[in-house]
Every structure is written in structure tokens, then in C-alpha cells.
Regions:
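Structured C-terminal cores of nucleic-acid metabolism proteins
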Residues: 1-74
Length: 74
């Protein structure tokens, strides 16, 4: 799903918990993918000690449709 569309879909769900999988760990941040709805975003809090493939429970903390940003926390 396009990140801007995903941000629109997720915007009313800020504060909800989601099951997610870690898809990337880089110096710029840790990225996770939720499966329902299919969306990927940045894990902004709680990223220490996670590896690609780890399954986590994450909370949606922000969604910005204009910029296509989706942020999660553990």
C-alpha cells in the first residue's frame, strides 16, 4: 500500500496496538510492518534489542498523510 494512503487509513487509529514484524534495522532507524492494514513505518521508541524478523506489539503514535510518515512505539 502507498505510504500516503496507509497514513490516511491509519490516521483514525492512532493509539491502537498492532502486531508487527521488524523489516529493517539501519542507522537511521528501525522499521516495522503491520499486516492489517498492510503498512510500514518507523519504530520511534523501543527499538533497542530488536532484529529483522522479530515480531512485536507496537502502538501507532502518529500518521501524516501529507508526508506519508507513520510512526510506531513499543
Amino acid at each position: 500500500m502507498n505510504k500516503r494512503i496507509a497514513a490516511v487509513v491509519l490516521l483514525p487509529r492512532i493509539g491502537e496496538m498492532f502486531s508487527a514484524v521488524v523489516t529493517g534495522v539501519t542507522p537511521k532507524g528501525t522499521f516495522v510492518r503491520v499486516l492489517n492494514p498492510h503498512a510500514e513505518g518507523l519504530l520511534i521508541r523501543g527499538q533497542q534489542g530488536v532484529d529483522v524478523g522479530d515480531q512485536l506489539q507496537v502502538k501507532l503514535v502518529s500518521a501524516d498523510p501529507r508526508r506519508g510518515y507513520i510512526d510506531f512505539a513499543r
